[in-house]
Amino acid sequence: MAKHLFTSESVSEGHPDKIADQISDAVLDAILEQDPKARVACETYVKTGMVLVGGEITTSAWVDIEEITRQTVRDIGYVHSDMGFDANSCAVLSAIGKQSPDINQGVDRTDPLEQGAGDQGLMFGYATNETDVLMPAPVTYAHRLVQRQSEVRKSGALPWLRPDAKSQITFQYDDGKIVGIDAVVLSTQHAEDISQKELQEAVMEEIIKPVLPTEWINASTKYHINPTGRFVIGGPMGDCGLTGRKIIVDTYGGMARHGGGAFSGKDPSKVDRSAAYAARYVAKNIVAAGLADRCEIQVSYAIGVAEPTSIMVETFGTEKISTETLTLLVREFFDLRPHGLIQMLDLLHPIYRETAAYGHFGREHFPWEKTDKAAQLREAAGLK
């Protein structure tokens, strides 16, 4: 592969679509805390002055949707009408129904191992050894930029920052290896009374420089900080937000394929979410084992059927053993049936709200980021 550029973006927790994702996952967590076997498909819409929570939920739990919504928005930092959105005064509307019994009969089984997939679909997982967390560098550093924006906003270091922000970063590659950062874009909502010059200097010193490795920065690296010159109106006042609208930000920043299914608001019986996590787990363990430098896994399911309809391993010519052998190892060491992967990754816990901002992958404390199968895979592959 010759020289090329690759770009990924991220958005902060205060971006309207991410507010929606976090509310949906906060509702899911509250329900799973009381009822781990609940069926949850929770969708959220946010716009100036209002939040609408809808979907299909079947559970024995009772949760206060309004209070969960307000607390989530409060935690993000929208606590005053000056910001264009206020957790304390926004309207919260609920339109929740129950999961269709036609779906239930395909998912629930007397034998848990025969639990069927909650829907048909295809999911991808990916890993690469270009970063220490085995994630693509562009999306990893795009996330870290907006995470840093949140840190300095919440700590009071830059008190004029507001919750809505976006980042974008372009990396230079030569023969598949990173050689530098070509361009950095960071746009952040801000208070009315901060000058463009002061904002740009502070963002460079307090957000960009602490995050980006100096070895990838050079004299030709370009910076675009609030390039429109003004970003006072943001959050739900600037744009409406909807659950599931940031699926590339949530995954690999465009460097891997995507099956199209969103994650937030869905309990683990929905393979859109749980099988995508399992596919990441498989790919990461293959790369951690040194069996490939890059690995993409595809799995697919039929509604009501436990066994995956397909498993595909793609290693882009970086494999150390054949992809046929890798596929056999995946089938041997990973149970990718819905119940099997839920047990394998211990998914029936309220861990999802935190996934809903700054990426579902590459943060080591999530169970699908473990590399506990790497040594077994390496041994089974016959590599020393």
From Swiss-Prot:
Where primarily located?
cytoplasm
Segments crossing the lipid bilayer: none
Keyword Disulfide bond in the entry? The reply is: no
Q: Which GO terms describe its biological process?
A: one-carbon metabolic process; S-adenosylmethionine biosynthetic process
Q: Where does Mg(2+) bind?
A: 17
Cystine bridges: none
Subunit architecture: Homotetramer; dimer of dimers.
Q: What is this protein called?
A: S-adenosylmethionine synthase
Report the source organism. Answer: Erwinia tasmaniensis (strain DSM 17950 / CFBP 7177 / CIP 109463 / NCPPB 4357 / Et1/99)
Organism ancestry: Bacteria, Pseudomonadati, Pseudomonadota, Gammaproteobacteria, Enterobacterales
